[in-house]
């Protein structure tokens, strides 16, 4: 269920403060965060944020298309290794 418009988006205050510091800098550093539930706002566009997936920080470059989504959507937590392929013995039966 989406969040009410009158409440506004959820953004971690520490993450917002780090982005405000780097807003006018020419060389922007990667910002590490554990806040996967923060909503991407237009202020984030052009920054590179490393989002924690439970094992490592995955760097995500924020574009205009990502505004309104959550940071956690862009750092998958599970690795898909594919289904087992059937043996040739099983195919003959």
Curated annotation (Swiss-Prot):
Task: Cite the entry's keywords alphabetically.
Answer: Ribonucleoprotein, Ribosomal protein, RNA-binding, rRNA-binding
Region Disordered, as annotated, extends over 72-93
**Gene3D superfamilies for this protein:** 30s Ribosomal Protein S19, Chain A (3.30.860.10)
* UniProt record, GO biological process: ribosomal small subunit assembly; translation
Q: Which InterPro entries match?
A: Ribosomal_uS19 (IPR002222), Ribosomal_uS19_bac-type (IPR005732), Ribosomal_uS19_CS (IPR020934), Ribosomal_uS19_SF (IPR023575)
Q: Where is the composition biased (Basic residues)?
A: 80-93
Please state what the protein is called. Answer: Small ribosomal subunit protein uS19
Q: Which organism is it from?
A: Aster yellows witches'-broom phytoplasma (strain AYWB)
């Amino acid at each position: 269920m989406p969040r009410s418009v009158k409440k506004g988006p959820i953004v971690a205050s520490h993450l917002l403060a780090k982005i405000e510091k780097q807003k006018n800098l020419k060389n922007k550093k990667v910002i590490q965060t554990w806040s996967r539930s923060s909503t991407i706002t237009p202020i984030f566009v052009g920054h590179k944020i490393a989002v924690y997936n439970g094992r490592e920080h995955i760097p995500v470059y924020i574009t205009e298309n990502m505004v309104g989504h959550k940071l956690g959507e862009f750092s998958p937590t599970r690795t898909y290794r594919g289904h087992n392929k059937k043996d040739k013995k099983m195919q003959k039966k």
